[in-house]
């Protein structure tokens, strides 16, 4: 099949401890894009294994490697790669071989020939354990209910962006979970397409059940500051949400006791429940204030929230 565009493509892949995946991933990307002009931008998020060494050993002229100075998380690794990207279209994907590079031409066709600013995947027949699928389903449900936007798979990393939209996404902390929503708020025309999904080739997943609480905190932040979306309030937000949930459970229990005819006014649990809810609200509010302060700091200083140690191409430092 002939390429659907002669424009340069930038494939941005954040990596953390993917030494056993990165060589095969590079091979699969090359096989999926014959005839295309592209650059592969690997962003090493301070891996503790031999990820960087194996990329440099490939000496692949298509590959750029960004070395971050410390572990910043997936969102800032994505931001670093997008900032460096030169392509007319920017493609993001995970480095664990669960996304299939052969889906990229089909997604590009939607972006190039139909004018979509963002083409995002919907993973079919997910090859993940319940530890990942259940939190993902809960997160997708919550996002749809709260935002009223029918995003079917927020967690799919395989996306094709128009360059202008990708460059306008100010990703902080771990906002990659809402990257489709953020693009929508920027006015992007979005297309969702089914894509293949594979079991992780090697290594271990970095996600677990705690993801649900992070999603709740992130959504509450998005709803509060909408177009100021920056860094999620995980430190204060998670604890605030947990305290409010515990306080709510205690109050539901006390309501049942009250309805059964017993007195609850002199029970210490009533006081504790109210204190938990108030403490949760206070923690969450502190988190919001800190988020706004952080955003003001970075924008006023014109600083990026990550630091690059070095960039190499084909194994040679630039």
Region annotations inferred by a language model:
Residues 2-5, 178-318:
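Hydrophobic helical membrane-anchoring modules
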Residues 8-10, 39:
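Cell-envelope/extracellular polymer assembly enzymes that use nucleotide-activated donors
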Residues 18-32:
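Short, well-formed alpha-helical segments that are part of the catalytic scaffolds
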Residues 26, 30, 37-47, 66-68:
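Short beta-strand/loop segment that forms part of the nucleotide-sugar
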Residues 44-53, 97:
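A conserved acidic beta->alpha catalytic loop
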Residues 64, 68-84, 89, 101-182, ...:
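Acceptor/aglycone-binding surface of glycosyltransferases and processive sugar-polymer synthases
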């Amino acid at each position: 099949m002939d390429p659907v565009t002669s424009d340069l493509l930038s494939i941005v892949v954040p990596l953390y401890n993917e030494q056993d995946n990165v060589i095969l991933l590079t091979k699969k990307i090359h096989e999926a894009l014959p005839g295309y002009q592209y650059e592969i931008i690997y962003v090493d998020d301070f891996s503790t294994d031999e990820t960087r060494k194996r990329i440099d050993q490939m000496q692949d002229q298509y590959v750029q490697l960004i070395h971050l100075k410390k572990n910043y998380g997936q969102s800032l690794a994505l931001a670093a790669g997008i900032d460096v990207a030169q392509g007319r279209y920017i493609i993001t994907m995970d480095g664990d071989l669960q996304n299939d590079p052969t889906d990229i031409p089909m997604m590009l066709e939607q972006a190039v020939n139909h004018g979509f600013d963002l083409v995002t995947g919907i993973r079919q027949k997910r090859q993940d354990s319940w530890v990942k699928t259940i939190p993902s389903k809960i997160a997708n449900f919550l996002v749809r209910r709260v935002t009223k936007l029918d995003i079917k798979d927020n967690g799919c990393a395989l996306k094709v962006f128009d360059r202008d939209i990708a460059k306008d996404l100010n990703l902080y902390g771990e906002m990659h979970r809402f990257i489709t929503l953020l693009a929508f708020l920027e006015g992007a025309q979005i297309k969702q397409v089914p894509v293949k999904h594979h079991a992780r080739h090697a290594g271990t997943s970095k996600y677990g059940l705690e993801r649900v609480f992070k999603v709740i905190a992130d959504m509450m932040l998005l709803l509060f500051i909408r177009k100021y979306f920056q860094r999620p309030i995980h430190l204060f937000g998670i604890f605030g949400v947990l305290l409010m949930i515990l306080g709510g459970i205690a109050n539901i229990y006390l309501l049942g006791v009250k309805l059964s005819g017993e007195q609850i006014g002199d029970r210490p649990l009533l006081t504790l429940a109210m204190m938990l809810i108030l403490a949760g609200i206070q923690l969450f509010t502190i988190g919001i204030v800190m988020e706004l302060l952080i955003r003001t700091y970075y924008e006023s200083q014109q600083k990026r929230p990550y630091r690059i140690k070095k960039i190499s191409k084909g194994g040679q430092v630039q």
